[in-house]
Amino acid sequence: MADDDNAVWAEYGDTLRLPIDADSDYISAIPWERAALIGDRPLIDIGCGSGLTTLALAARFPLAEILAVEPDPLMRSLLMLRVAERPEIRSRTTVLPESILDVWLPDECGGALLFNVIYFLGGRTRDRFWTRMAHVLVPGAPILMSRSYGGVPDTLVERHLAGSATMGRHEYQRFFEAKPAGEGRVEIVNTYVVLRDGEQVRTARTVVTPLSLDEEVILSEIPIGKFSIEEIDENYIAVRRQPDLRR
């Protein structure tokens, strides 16, 4: 039986990720200038997990109001801890527990981050998402979207070591594998192993089956009358709010 993915990631994820590797972690290469978020308006971090992207957003825009949206309670607890212990962002960062479809948001926001989230939204949910964002973004404000769509591998991705880190006497290892799961989904299995002095003392295994989406499908769903689409680089697209046409 698989363990809860969010609970396991809350325990192991940042231990394996921190400190940030500037050469490999996407946080170090967010294309802020080309995205051109509007920093004198509220900025949204959608599905921000434990808050590493929220900290990056707040650091890039040191005067902006930040809205951090994270429905999962375990990940949100890590997010809130990160915000709470930093007085320079605590007063201007609001942590919101609902999904992006249901959450309160202020009018006239200046942009949003959407990293590694879109493939967890079904087709009708994506339609509602774009409609919601059209209501809250000002003209010119972008949704900076990572080009990660949960693609189904053509063949089995064999289990392999995807990361390791140490803390005290423990070494933490993450093993990754994936395969097509049918009905447009991919099965992703992560196995976490804890070693003490070389001896295995704990394991956890998670299985998720996100939608596998082609970029062409995602982009075709974006309402062109409301947004323009800008290819920034191989990792990011800016979906930018356009002025409503007046008749």
Describe each model-derived feature in a short phrase:
Residues 146-213:
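SAM-dependent methyltransferase
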Residues 57-102:
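Class I SAM-dependent methyltransferase SAM/SAH-binding core
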